[in-house]
Amino acid sequence: MLNVMIQLLVVSLAVACAAPVLAAEQTHAQIDGTGARIRMFGQNGVGIVLYKDAVCTATYGEKVRASGSLGSAFGSLMGSVKNQAIGIPETQNTRNLHERKMIGSKPFYKEYAIEAGKPVVVEAGASSPAYWTSTPGFKSGWTCGPLLASTFVPEAGADYEVALDLDFRNSLCTLAVKRVAADGQVTPVDVAPVSKDCK
């Protein structure tokens, strides 16, 4: 068990050291106005993936797991995960990030440079682990059901944010894709549903 914890710590430190270099590289496309940027919210129990240059999840140029990896889950659980920003204006979601907090699940966001004019797919899901109680015994965890996925084509110079909004009372999950204006105001993006088999 100690070896596993040490390995997780080493991986977390390596990722933390690489993050500033990646952020510096990603901002270049946005500075010259030809690229776009996207902010993705995550936390322990929420998986969210970005597929670049894709209209489905089977064929894509690059797959970026913003949340749902072992490293991000561990960082969220321990409360050590940090936001990774490349300059997208603040929104209500970033200012009120604490409202997404759950026990053992610190919310965070990561921002990425994306190519304008090339479609992207965002895919997300959420679940909690199963657990045991004295009565009635084994209980399955909470889940959104099937993964939610949407596709859209980013515009040059535009900023976007993607979040999986969870409504536990009504057992409802919504994949919210919004465009971020320079003043931080957001508007919904016209997205299309995604097919896994690219047909």
Which residue stretches match the model-derived regions?
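A cross-family signal for key residues in well-ordered alpha-helices
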Residues: 12
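Bacterial N-terminal signal peptides that target proteins for export
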Residues: 1-9
